């Protein structure tokens, strides 16, 4: 029983209250038609009858079961398939959006159609249209969508042996590997996904996928690539390549609207309490201390929380931050252009997107160090890295405030950014290599 409660608690910590409620309803009531909105490690309830090892393992790792695909005869027509959990609005920021941009550019280069298979939520085509339009991209071929839910095995779809599958997580990779040749898979890896878990079965299975030598890898940033190789995944050096993400000025740029004379400056915090790697609780402690020490003067700064599932909170003598959630990509980009200073934490080696989004939009950003992620000035001199501890981050915010209000220096740093501004440039080498093979 203790183990059951621990699994339920772990599920809640990872996926949040909304997903936990859905899971509880699924366990206690009739099975819903749609699967939960995120890959889950199912809570295994006691059974009246003994189950085999295979049955228990299958129930525990249902998301790893092979995709329900059937093979079609060879066809001269080309298709690329992206396999991901969801393309809902809240899922598109960062990694999934990157996968769709990459797949679109590759499909256009290869003269291929593009299919998106989702596993946890029905695909919403309008969301793909929105992100492509924001970046000025148009798919030349046909766009297709298919929902193959994790928890339902009565739906299937087709594939051909020449089809290229772009997977977006270790679990979508594992599921796809059960149905198509390994040589057909390109795993778009955008985080050290082992760090999603404590040491246990999930982490072990994740590492087994990350260590495979029969699939190709595309890694988001050289920083993450170097970390993975240095941490024992030598197959990544042999079977993988990396890219640096792009931040086109048509999307991320300083706002053209001047601040009102005497108007308050904007401070943003990337607030995702249910994504533990974002160090939400350290972040709010840092903000509280920064206010107490007058680093963030509430007469000068508006505090904005951007994220998901953010609880109501007050700072200082009752100040409530502004909350912005469930924004579209264009709304998020527009907000980023109005920010002066940001705090965005990520307790992994990857720099993560929000600090880079903000730096590309002209803001100063404080983030934390982790492993080989010690300095991000290669991207922008407006990025300040500090140890992941309260005092160090408060001091970094003090430096950030000074830089944010020093408009000439801040602008000079912005103009000297080392961020790529063109996705076609970011992916050019990979796209040419793949186009030559497929």
What are these regions (language model features)?
Residues 95-98, 115, 225-323, 327-329:
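Conserved catalytic-core segment of nucleotide-activated headgroup transferases in glycan assembly
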Residues 148-153, 309, 320-336, 351:
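Conserved active-site histidine-acidic residue motif and adjacent donor-binding/catalytic loop
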Residues 154-160, 200-218:
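Membrane-proximal helix-turn-helix segments that form the acceptor-binding/catalytic region
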Residues 171, 175-176, 213-239:
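A short, active-site helix/loop in glycosyltransferases that binds the activated sugar's phosphate group
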Residues 346-347:
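Aromatic "clamp/platform" in nucleotide-sugar-dependent glycosyltransferases that forms part
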Residues 364-368:
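Short hydrophobic beta-strand element within catalytic cores of glycosyltransferases
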Residues 388, 402-438:
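A charged, aromatic-enriched C-terminal amphipathic alpha-helix characteristic of glycosyltransferases
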């Amino acid at each position: 029983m203790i183990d059951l409660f621990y699994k339920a608690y772990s599920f809640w910590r990872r996926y949040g209250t909304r997903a936990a409620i859905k899971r509880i309803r699924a366990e206690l009531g009739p099975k819903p038609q749609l699967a939960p909105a995120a890959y889950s490690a199912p809570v295994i309830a006691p059974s009246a009858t003994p189950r085999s090892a295979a049955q228990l393992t299958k129930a525990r790792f249902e998301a790893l079961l092979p995709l329900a695909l059937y093979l079609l005869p060879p066809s001269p027509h080309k298709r690329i398939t992206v396999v991901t959990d969801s393309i809902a609005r809240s899922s598109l920021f960062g990694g999934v959006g990157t996968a769709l941009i990459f797949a679109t550019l590759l499909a256009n280069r290869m003269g291929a159609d593009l299919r998106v298979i989702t596993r946890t939520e029905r695909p919403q085509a309008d969301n793909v249209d929105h992100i492509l339009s924001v970046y000025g991209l148009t798919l030349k071929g046909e766009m297709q969508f298919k929902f193959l839910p994790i928890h339902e095995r009565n739906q299937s779809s087709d594939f051909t042996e020449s089809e290229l599958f772009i997977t977006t997580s270790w679990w979508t990779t594992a599921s796809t590997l059960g149905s198509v040749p390994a040589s057909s898979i390109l795993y778009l890896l955008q985080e050290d996904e082992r760090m999603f878990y404590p040491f246990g079965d999930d982490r072990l299975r994740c590492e087994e996928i990350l260590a495979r030598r029969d699939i190709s890898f595309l890694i988001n940033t050289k920083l993450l690539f170097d970390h993975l190789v240095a941490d024992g995944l030598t197959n990544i050096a042999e079977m993988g390549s990396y890219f640096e993400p792009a931040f086109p000025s048509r999307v991320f740029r300083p706002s053209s609207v001047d601040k009102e004379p005497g108007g308050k400056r904007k401070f943003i915090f990337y607030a995702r309490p249910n994504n533990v790697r974002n160090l939400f609780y350290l972040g709010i402690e840092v903000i509280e201390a920064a206010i107490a020490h007058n680093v963030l003067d509430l007469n000068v700064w508006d505090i904005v929380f951007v994220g998901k599932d953010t609880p109501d909170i007050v700072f200082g003598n009752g100040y409530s931050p502004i909350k912005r959630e469930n924004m579209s990509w264009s709304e998020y980009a527009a907000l980023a252009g109005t920010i002066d200073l940001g705090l965005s934490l990520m307790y992994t080696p990857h720099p993560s997107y929000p600090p880079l989004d903000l730096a590309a939009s002209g803001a100063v950003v404080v983030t934390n160090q982790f492993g080989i992620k010690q300095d991000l000035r290669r991207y922008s001199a407006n990025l300040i890295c500090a140890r992941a501890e309260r005092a160090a981050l408060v001091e970094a915010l003090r430096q950030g405030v000074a830089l944010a209000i020093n408009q000439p220096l801040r602008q000079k740093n912005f103009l000297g950014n080392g961020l790529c501004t063109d996705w076609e440039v970011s992916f050019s080498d990979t796209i040419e290599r793949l186009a030559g093979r497929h």
